[in-house]
Amino acid sequence: MKEELDAFHQIFTTTKEAIERFMAMLTPVIENAEDDHERLYYHHIYEEEEQRLSRLDVLIPLIEKFQDETDEGLFSPSNNAFNRLLQELNLEKFGLHNFIEHVDLALFSFTDEERQTLLKELRKDAYEGYQYVKEKLAEINARFDHDYADPHAHHDEHRDHLADMPSAGSSHEEVQPVAHKKKGFTVGSLIQ
């Protein structure tokens, strides 16, 4: 578990820096938006990433606490602090997924070389981190909770929809439709 924690710490520290760079890029776009739609669109993305920063401010010290821990018995589902760490890690796996999508959206809008270069670098690092976190958390969750089912697993069921990086020149017509698996009953689906 120590090896995974070291990697998680590196990934989320790097992610925090990436979010700050991304937000710094968005700030002048929001301030100089041509219309309300553009301002609200990027402000919404900015606020979501701002919320992630506050979650990372909680997660990173929690990882550090367990990195320094010598009592292996504390790495157990019976330890509430360890359970919280696992919950925060699973939440941030989804946060990484969202960050990649935000960067992908920005890649469509910002076609200048400087921002394209920055965004592609941020995306590459975030995607690699996401893949590692996704894989390791699946292993950790299987190790500690045999009944665990990732509620977001449908995102990656048949193919990782984040794998194909969009380009600034892509058109909406080039996007292949995603086949959705028919879902069963849901809360409220039987209410008439």
Swiss-Prot record:
Biotechnology remark: The encapsulin and cargo pair can be overexpressed in E.coli and in human HEK293T cells. In HEK293T in the presence of 0.5 M ferrous ammonium sulfate nanocompartments can be detected and used as cell markers. Can also be targeted to cell membranes by addition of a farnesylation signal to its C-terminus. Coexpression of this nanocompartment with a smaller nanocompartment from M.xanthus (AC Q1D6H4) allows of expression of different sized iron-rich particles. The encapsulin shell proteins are not seen to mix.
Cellular component, GO, one term: encapsulin nanocompartment
Reactions catalysed according to its record: 4 Fe(2+) + O2 + 4 H(+) = 4 Fe(3+) + 2 H2O
Residue span of region Targeting peptide: 180-192
Location(s) in or outside the cell: Encapsulin nanocompartment
Comp. bias intervals (Basic and acidic residues): 149-163
Record has Membrane as a keyword: no
Residue numbers spanned by region Disordered: 149-192
Biological process per Gene Ontology, one example term: intracellular iron ion homeostasis
Residues noted as binding Fe(3+) in the record, renumbered to the chain: H44, E48, H102
Temperature dependence of activity: The empty encapsulin nanocompartment is stable until 86.6 degrees Celsius, when loaded with cargo protein is stable until 88.9 degrees Celsius and when grown in high-iron conditions is stable until 91.8 degrees Celsius.
Keyword tags: Encapsulin nanocompartment, Iron, Iron storage, Oxidoreductase
Chain intervals for the UniProt region annotation (Linker): 143-179
Enzyme class (EC, first level): oxidoreductase
GO molecular function, one term: ferroxidase activity
Keyword match Oxidoreductase: yes
Domain notes: The C-terminus (targeting peptide) is probably responsible for targeting to the encapsulin nanocompartment; it is separated from the rest of the protein by a flexible 37-residue linker.
Function, in words: Cargo protein of a type 1 encapsulin nanocompartment. A ferritin-like iron-binding protein probably involved in iron mineralization in the encapsulin nanocompartment. Has ferroxidase activity even when encapsulated, the rate is probably controlled by the rate of Fe flux across the nanocompartment pores. Part of the iron-mineralizing encapsulin-associated Firmicute (IMEF) system. 2 different cargo proteins have been identified (IMEF and Fer); when both are expressed in E.coli with the shell protein only IMEF is detected within the nanocompartment.
SUBUNIT field: Homodimer, with 2 Fe atoms bound at the subunit interface (without encapsulin), probably also a dimer when encapsulated. 42 electron-dense accretions can be seen inside the nanocompartment which are probably this cargo protein, although perhaps up to one cargo dimer can be bound per shell protein.
Name under which the protein is recorded: Ferritin-like protein
Protein species of origin: Bacillus thermotolerans (Quasibacillus thermotolerans)
Gene encoding the protein: IMEF
